[in-house]
Amino acid sequence: LDGFGKTNGRLTGMVKKFIPIAKKSSLTFTGRGGIKLHGSDMPEIMAYRLGGPYTIRGYKVNGVGTGTSFIMGSVELATPIPFVDRLKVNFLQNLRLTFWVDAGKVFDPTIASVLYDRPIQAITAGIGLKINMPGVGPLSVDYGFPLTNPGPNGSPNGYFTFGVGDMMY
């Protein structure tokens, strides 16, 4: 349990830019990064993780890798689904079709990333549905597939991810 009982510091930041397109569509750019500030070996539990619905969609949680620092970005186009507004169902007015690309890399991979032969870096693209439910917040389902080698433990055919809350918290 190397690293436990020691002081470790991390710094994480995020930049997000929304650009409205037409009446109900938007383009979102997101960039995130994190780094270990001080301390000796970072315990696995404190490592940054990439893969899953809030980081690199199209991979299982932690499927890209874990490490002491990371950088990632995402571009997402959200637009209403054609003809859904004609259904006159209130909550469906908040339903959006999304097209996105995620990319990221972890640095100084942890022992788990090495043992499980995770790819450490990934670029994915995909399509999804997002709905903003009153009282719950955004719900999303995405299907993404890797544009880079997913490694021996990843799926070259892609992966579904489900999210509750903001896509890139």
Annotate each PLM feature:
Residues N132-Y169:
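Predominantly the C-terminal beta-signal and adjacent terminal strand-loop region
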Residues R96, V101, I111-A112, Y143, ...:
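Extended, folded domain segments that form the structural surfaces/walls around functional sites
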Residues L87-K88, L115-R118, N149-G154:
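Short proline/glycine-enriched turn/loop segments at secondary-structure junctions
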Residues Q93-L97, Q121-A125, P134-L139, G158-F160:
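A short pocket-lining beta-strand/turn micro-motif at the edge of beta-sheets
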Residues L77, I127-N132:
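Short basic/hydrophobic patches in alpha-helices and adjacent helix-turn junctions
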Residues V101-Y116, G135:
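C-terminal beta-signal and adjacent terminal beta-strands/loops
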Residues A112-L129:
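A short alpha/beta connector and helix-capping loop motif
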Residues L1-L95, F99-W100, F107-P109, G154, ...:
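C-terminal outer-membrane beta-barrel translocator/porin domains of Gram-negative envelope proteins
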